[in-house]
Amino acid sequence: VILTNNTALLEVLRQKWPDIPAKNWEIRPLTGLTQGSHYITDGVHQMVGRRQTWHGGTLGVNRQRENRILHKLSFVGIAPKVIAMHGDWLLLEWLSGTKVTAETFGLPSFQQSLAQIVANLHHHSPLGYSLQLKQQITYQWQQIDNRRLLPDWLRLHKLFMTAKMPTPLKIAPAHMDIHPDNLLMTSEGLKLIDWEYATDVDIGFSLATLFKGNQWSEIQQKTFLNYYCTYASGYIDIVLLEQKIKQWEPWVRYMMLMWYEVRWQRTKEPQFSALAHPLRLSFNLAF
């Protein structure tokens, strides 16, 4: 018998809270590029249910890893707390707060707050889950339609696979998917949600991902780094950090290109092809 998401989730809720009638639970899907998340309430409890799916696995999502990471970060105060891990389902607290708009996200005053929580995260000891970037890219490469792998792209891929990666400044935890939709301003301060891609990386790689993923201008990047490097938990040498971010930037672009290509391959949704297009152009891949 193939259970629908709601039926499978209801069974998990029934086992965890047997005294609550199944009809009392309200479940609705939450939006997101990788999907698989649901809002859950019985009128008293409020939770987020995040399911492990095969599709998410092709993008590197692992709910067991996410569960362990969130437990390790529970005292940092910038992430939702874990309620339970049951089978393929990760149940998290529902964070109430105000969504961060794209306009607010780019303001210097907000960048100051964001720089502080990123610096605090980078100050935490490694989580024990290092990003194996070349391994990830190799796996994603195998998911792409061979008809798209033209000679220029084959040469580019070989270049990245044989190139030496930049020497890390400092390996630290990173969220890896910071953008307005994954930020909430709560009564306890700024919080990050959706930690499914969290891993240990060089702080230069983490910041290059933040900057490139949000298309920040040079001024916005400089503003953020000025704040980041003034915090005790940040990195003191801004010049060295800027150099390292630049070294990582092409690797970040290639990582993003592979992610969008796999998403397009799996869903055929135009948004992923559109997101991949400027990245293809940046590598002179004309298709």
Model-based region annotation:
Residues 66, 108-109, 191, 208-211, ...:
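Glycine-rich, phosphate-binding/catalytic loops in enzymes
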Residues 204-235, 250-267:
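Active-site activation/catalytic loop segments of kinase-like enzymes and analogous catalytic loops
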Residues 21-28:
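Conserved N-terminal boundary motif of the eukaryotic protein kinase catalytic domain
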Residues 235-249:
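All-alpha amphipathic helical-bundle segments outside canonical DNA-binding/catalytic cores
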Residues 29-30, 34-130:
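ATP-binding pocket architecture of kinase catalytic cores
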Residues 258-287:
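ATP/Mg2+ or Mg2+-diphosphate-binding catalytic cores
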Residues 5-21, 126-176, 186, 237, ...:
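An alpha-helical support segment within catalytic cores of ATP-dependent transferases
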Residues 34-43, 47-49, 161-205, 219:
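Active-site acidic catalytic loop and adjacent metal/ATP-binding pocket
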